Swiss-Prot record:
Lineage of the species this protein comes from: Eukaryota, Viridiplantae, Streptophyta, Embryophyta, Tracheophyta
GO biological processes: photosynthesis, light reaction
TM ranges: 5-25
Primary localisation category: plastid
Keywords: Chloroplast, Membrane, Photosynthesis, Photosystem II, Plastid, Reaction center, Thylakoid, Transmembrane, Transmembrane helix
Species name: Gnetum parvifolium
Protein name: Photosystem II reaction center protein M
GO cellular component terms given for this protein: chloroplast thylakoid membrane; photosystem II
Oligomeric form and interacting partners: PSII is composed of 1 copy each of membrane proteins PsbA, PsbB, PsbC, PsbD, PsbE, PsbF, PsbH, PsbI, PsbJ, PsbK, PsbL, PsbM, PsbT, PsbX, PsbY, PsbZ, Psb30/Ycf12, at least 3 peripheral proteins of the oxygen-evolving complex and a large number of cofactors. It forms dimeric complexes.
């Protein structure tokens, strides 16, 4: 079974970018509440 490196990178970015974005918003919200 051949693994497509570009596909793995695309999936990793597609998952990690929105997740990091949500984490940043979450941290900013906590900081503002304090």
């Amino acid at each position: 079974m051949e693994v497509n490196i570009l596909a793995l990178i695309a999936i990793a970015l597609f998952i990690s970018v929105p997740t990091a974005f949500l984490i940043i918003i979450y941290v900013k919200t906590i900081s503002e509440n304090n």
